[in-house]
A protein has these predicted regions:
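A structural signal for multi-pass alpha-helical bundles of membrane permease subunits
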Residues: 2-283
Length: 283
């Protein structure tokens, strides 16, 4: 009986899990291997001795050196970090206060307003593209980081608000009522009682907003035209793909370096991220 249970566990759990892990992680493995391959193995593998498509025996840092010496990759990294952090902070501040108001304050049409905010999040970004481009042009913000810092919250705030609404609803109202009885104002109760309890939800919303801002491509491609103002997704694809010529090594190196900040954010806050999403669903 025990042997049968072990067999079923291997067949129905471990083998499918191993398959999905390989399926999900193989692109990252291929990206890492390609970024360290010399050009000879990338473009003329038939001339390379002991060529292995899944491994390289002569790793090189030339592609990373090319990124930092021959392109503006350092500027792209700085621009992406600045835009992602600024838009995330703006979206979190607005989302936390809006989520608290819609979930904890009793006023007419609060539920309908919350539903409307979530529907706004579902609106495709392409529908907002033309009016946002007109606003950016009228205020002369084109080709500046502000063009993205002020437009990204249009799709980040609705999600942050919806997530925080669910999390605030899961926080017992008795905590806030006890603080009010002890003489705290609503502002003090929210700031010192509710928000500290909702930290996992805030971190979840922040990680999600940061990831979307970091990886966003369409707005960054259109609103930023100068090479020194571009973000990593736009700079890597526009400068390292020239017609039908692909600089595969530098492309993969740029993708690898560009994915590190997001991977670090998830690895450090994954527990808070999962608990935050769980709390928002329960709410």
């Amino acid at each position: 009986m025990i042997e049968g249970a072990k067999w079923r566990r291997w067949v129905f759990f471990y083998l499918p899990m191993a398959f999905f892990l390989i399926f999900l992680l193989f692109p990252f493995y291929w990206m890492i291997i390609t970024s360290f391959r010399p050009d000879g193995e990338l473009y003329r593998p038939w001339n390379s001795a002991n060529y292995n498509p899944f491994w390289t025996w002569k790793p090189t840092l030339d592609h990373f050196r090319y990124l930092f010496e021959e392109t503006l990759f350092s500027a792209w990294l700085w621009n992406t970090m600045l835009i992602a952090l600024a838009s995330t902070v703006i979206s979190l501040v607005c989302g936390v206060f809006a989520g608290y108001a819609l979930s904890r304050l009793n006023f007419p049409f609060a539920g309908s307003l919350g539903t409307g905010i979530f529907i706004t999040y579902l609106v495709p970004q392409t529908l907002l593209f033309i009016p946002l481009a007109e606003i950016i042009r009228n205020y002369k913000l084109g080709d500046t980081p502000w063009s993205l810092i002020l437009t990204y919250p249009t799709f980040l705030i609705p999600f942050c608000t919806w997530l925080m609404m669910g999390y605030f609803k899961a926080v017992p109202k008795e905590l806030e009522e006890c603080a009010r009885i002890d003489g705290a104002s609503r502002w003090q109760a929210m700031l010192y009682i509710i928000i500290p309890v909702a930290i996992p939800g805030i971190l979840s919303a922040g990680i999600f907003a940061f990831t979307l801002s970091w990886n966003e491509f369409i707005y960054a491609l259109v609103f930023l035209s100068s090479p020194e103002q571009k973000t990593v997704p736009v700079g890597v694809t526009s400068e390292l793909i020239r017609g039908d010529v692909f600089f595969w090594g530098a492309l993969m190196a740029g993708a690898l370096l560009g994915s590190i900040p997001v991977a670090i954010a998830y690895s450090f806050f994954v527990e808070h991220y999962v608990s935050g999403l769980t709390g928002s669903v329960k709410g």
